[in-house]
């Protein structure tokens, strides 16, 4: 994988993680929020941009697409969900990647007193 491609994938993941896609337990619709549907539409657009085929969003909020391979081999699938648990605050999230993570504590730039420690998990 080239460094440019790796950077693009990393930036895409960070952008997805920053989207407020919190579920609404009281909703009778699927997806349960407009933000979740917006994320599905973003994924649909990005799949079109990379020339994926057979793109569709199902009534259950699932994006399906085919990305043809560049050589013969087994078919693979990628699965993920777009919702965030309702117990989690999904607003104003500032995701980041820590390259070369050493397994120690992680501090948060906006609140250095907030620490994520492997000892707590």
Residue ranges and their predicted role:
Residues 1-2:
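Charged, compositionally biased N-terminal leader segments and the immediate start
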Residues 6-34:
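N-terminal capping segment at the start of a domain
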Residues 23-24, 54, 89:
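Secondary-structure transition/capping residues
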Residues 28-83, 93, 98:
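A non-catalytic alpha/beta surface segment that caps or lines the substrate-entry region
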Residues 74-121:
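Active-site metal-coordination/substrate-binding segment of hydrolases
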């Amino acid at each position: 994988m080239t460094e440019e491609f790796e950077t693009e994938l990393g930036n895409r993941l960070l952008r997805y993680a920053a989207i407020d896609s919190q579920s609404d337990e009281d909703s009778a619709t699927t997806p349960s929020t407009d933000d979740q549907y917006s994320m599905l539409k973003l994924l649909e657009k990005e799949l079109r941009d990379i020339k994926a085929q057979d793109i569709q969003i199902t009534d259950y909020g699932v994006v399906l697409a085919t990305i043809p391979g560049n050589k013969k081999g087994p078919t693979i699938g990628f699965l993920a969900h777009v919702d965030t648990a309702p117990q989690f605050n999904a607003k104003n999230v500032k995701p980041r990647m820590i390259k070369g993570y050493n397994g120690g504590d992680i501090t948060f730039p906006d609140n250095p007193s907030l620490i994520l420690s492997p000892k707590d998990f």
